[in-house]
Structure formats: structure tokens, C-alpha cells
Amino acid sequence: MRRDRSLLPVLGWLVVLAVVGALALAGALRVAEAQRATPDPTARVIVVFGDSLTAGYGVTPAEAYPGRLHARLAAEGYRYRIVNAGVSGDTTAGGLRRVDWALSVKPSIAIVALGANDGLRGQSTVEMEQNLERIVERFQSGGARVLLAGMRLPPNYGGRYAGEFERAFAQAASRRGVVLMPFLLEGVGGEPSLNLPDGIHPTAEGHRIIADRLWPYLVPMLSK
């Protein structure tokens, strides 16, 4: 059957208009979503400065512990907003290099949750401790109060190294005079049902527990 070539330009324009219309609709939806998510400009900022545990690897932003803290702050009448500054794979050295970005959001509180990747890679606990101190100091110099979240290593890393690793957080917190949550993954780390199949990253329920256990350390730092 012979095609009517006179229809080709018309069909071409219809395709173009359909694509343009779809893009316009998608753009409008993105704008609407952004407008709904626009933060309160008068709210104080809490930056959560960490690695993939903070970024929420394997869960949604709302399910990750920073998102759960944000929801609880709003529910209990605190005018704060959470900025999730978690970067997967980050170490304390990497964190130190990006503190300036975190300070650009002018946080009144910083939750520092780095060090897990230092330990998993067997890096120097002395250098990690120094990095943590410098990170905390930078936040303090920028006017933020700091909550330092510690980490612990599995027994297979050796008692001596695991002990030095854990003490590094306590010593850094003591020297900088900040609040220490001894173990971010308390009640979650090592529990198969609360972690993804990799055995490292928490499930949504694991993140709920982290947020609940972190809350009592955070509340005394808040104001309404």
C-alpha cells in the first residue's frame, strides 16, 4: 500500500508537540514538587555529616535516619530542618575536605558521623582521630554545636585495633568538649534482620532505631 507523504510533516509536528507537552508537564511537576519541599527559611539548620550510613544507602531519604529526625523535629514543634550531608564511601579525610560546603548552609548543629570507612579499610586510628578533631573544630569555629557519633568494629578486626578505633571517638569528643553518642549503630549493627544483605547498611527499620537512639543526645541541644 502506498503511503500518503503529505501526512508526514503533520505527523512529525504531532510528535514534536507531544514531546514538548510531556517535557512541560514533567517540568511543572518538578517545580510543584520543589515548591512543596521548599524549606522554611527561618528554620535553624542541622547538618548530618557522614557516609553511606547517613546518606541512606538502600533506603529512601525519608526512611534514612536523618529523614526520620527531620520528621520528628517537625512533629514535636522544633523549627529545624535537616540537611543530609552523607557521602557514600567517605572517610574522615574526605569529610575534612568538604567541611566548607557543609558550613555554607550555616548549621546551628552538626551531627558528625564519620569513621566507619576508616575502620573498614584499616586506616590509622591516630590520623582518624586527628581528622575528627579538625572536623569538629571547623564546625565549632563556624558557630555550630557538635554531636559526634562514634563507631565500633566487628571482633574480626582484632581487639587492639578495635579498641584504639573506639577510643579515638571518645578522645576526640573529650578534647573538643562535644557530646558523644558512643555507637551510632547501637542495637542495629550485627543484627541480620536490621541490615541489608551486605550486612553493613541498615534497613528502614534499622534506621528507625538509629533515629530513636540518637534523639536523646540531640534534644538537649535544641531550642524552640
Regions found by a protein language model. Name each.
Residues 2-5, 9, 75-78, 94-224:
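Alpha-helical cap/lid subdomain in secreted, periplasmic
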Residues 32-88, 98-106:
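Serine-esterase "nucleophile elbow" of acetyl-processing enzymes
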Residues 89-93:
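Acidic-and-aromatic substrate-binding clefts and catalytic sites of carbohydrate-active enzymes
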Residues 13-26:
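Bacterial N-terminal signal peptides
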